[in-house]
Amino acid sequence: MTDKSNNPAPASDPSTTETSNDADGSDGQLDAETDPGTSTGPSDLDDVILDNLDAGSDDPSDEASRGLFDDLLEGEPIFENKEVLRPSYTPHKLPHREEQINNMATILVTALRGDTPSNILIYGKTGTGKTASAKFVSEELETTSQKYEVPCEVEYINCEVTDTQYRVLAQLANKFIDKNAQLIDDRIAELEELQSQARENTAALEETAFGSLDDVEAEIESLEADKSEFEEVPMTGWPTDRVYSSFFDAVDYHERVVVIMLDEIDKLVEKSGDDTLYNLSRMNSELENSRVSIMGISNDLKFTDFLDPRVKSSLGEEEIVFPPYDANQLRDILQARSDVAFKGDALTEDVIPLCAAFAAQEHGDARRALDLLRTAGELAERDQTDNVLEDHVRQAQEKIELDRVVEVVRTLPTQSKIVLFAIILLEKNGVHNINTGEVFNIYKNLCEEIDADILTQRRVTDLISELDMLGIVNAVVVSKGRYGRTKEISLSVPTEETEAVLLSDSRLGDIDDVQPFVQARFDN
């Protein structure tokens, strides 16, 4: 990516070319002490900083004046543009997704003819390129619509964040209200310019639809009245039908085809049911000027099982499945991104294959592969080494896995945390082959200590199964002969780190002495 500035490179290095972003995507500008008449691009900034560091005087007092970051800046940066390794980045080319992209384009091309595209459901596991591909196609659609002057817009909603009908409709309403306001302002500006020209020469109106200056003024007043009718929707407080009405009026203000992209659409259905999808999928029968199409993206291939048959029928007109990437495909993706993300030969030859291999084990997750590569690069920078090594990748794998565990444990419900804490206490005190009864005894005492409700042993068994599904514990059903069957439970995550996360919860952190609860195992 090149800098749009036309200023020359610094005189000290006329061969230097400029790039728009440094490793962290910032604009990197020099202060006034450099050369006030010269614009220095971000790619030059690293060199200037290093030159300034190396050019310090021999005065011993300089050592004392060195700041916290001076030593860290002395090493050569590894990254050229770290942002291309983040999930938010949409590349200009998506390897191994050509078929899915072409399928989407074939369906959406009807929007460029002014017709309503079929609704699309996109399925695939995390990190299979669903959202990136959909955004790429959407950007191409909007670019082409501008080229041919066909009004076509795509609006993106992340349903993991915007997960209720009210929030979805309010966010959409406000987006279209803002667009309408901008459209009206632009039109008024054009009419005011026409007014100005017509006052000097009435011939300016001859090739327009206006017969007089009064007609122009009337049109301006009409537009201002339209704008005043659009009221921004608050994120809470209105009846849902009023929010829907605001969205409906805003989207139908003028002719256009609108594609509403609902990412993580299953989260919306899980939280709020299918009312939102029902309303969106049926509104075309009432719209007069605009047409609406839905593009839903989901990690769950079975979420439509919970939909009303009418919604399922209209929503799933077209389905596109994104299969997991294999190791070779992940290697291609990483290679393409690394060429832009890293400087020179920063990566040793075994780094990309190892990142690809680790991610292939995680159901072909490209997002995981990119996170691994970025984290490995960050670890190498912290080590102040010139290269990213295989060891950095292995450290990154451990760090990402630990971060995942910490986040999962941190967001567990309180009862699940108590059950997990009971298992940790048993393991820390040397108890092997932990069974459900032992966990339940410790659990009861913990609940009494923090004044929490005590669930039944059957419900605690269910919570253990849920922890097993999350990969936090390993619970195996074993037969005890005439004594029946039981679950043998063990931790699948680091004990110390997991305990620290649990104790950060204010309720569990109030427990002063855990030893009596472990002793309860032998007393019950």
UniProtKB/Swiss-Prot annotation:
Gene Ontology MF: a single term: ATP hydrolysis activity
Record's compositionally biased regions (Polar residues): 1-23
Annotated segments matching region Disordered: 1-67
One protein family per Pfam: Cdc6_lid
Highest rank taxon of the organism: Archaea
Role of this protein: Involved in regulation of DNA replication.
Alphabetized Gene3D superfamilies for the sequence: 1.10.8.60, P-loop containing nucleotide triphosphate hydrolases, Winged helix-like DNA-binding domain superfamily/Winged helix DNA-binding domain
InterPro entries to which the protein is assigned, alphabetical: AAA+_ATPase (IPR003593), AAA_16 (IPR041664), Cdc6_C (IPR015163), Cdc6_lid (IPR055237), ORC1/CDC6 (IPR050311), Orc1/Cdc6_arc (IPR014277), P-loop_NTPase (IPR027417), WH-like_DNA-bd_sf (IPR036388)
Record's keyword terms, sorted: ATP-binding, DNA replication, Nucleotide-binding
UniProt family annotation: Belongs to the CDC6/cdc18 family.
GO biological process terms held by the UniProt record: DNA replication
UniProt binding sites for ATP: 128-132, 325, 337
Record-given protein name: ORC1-type DNA replication protein 4
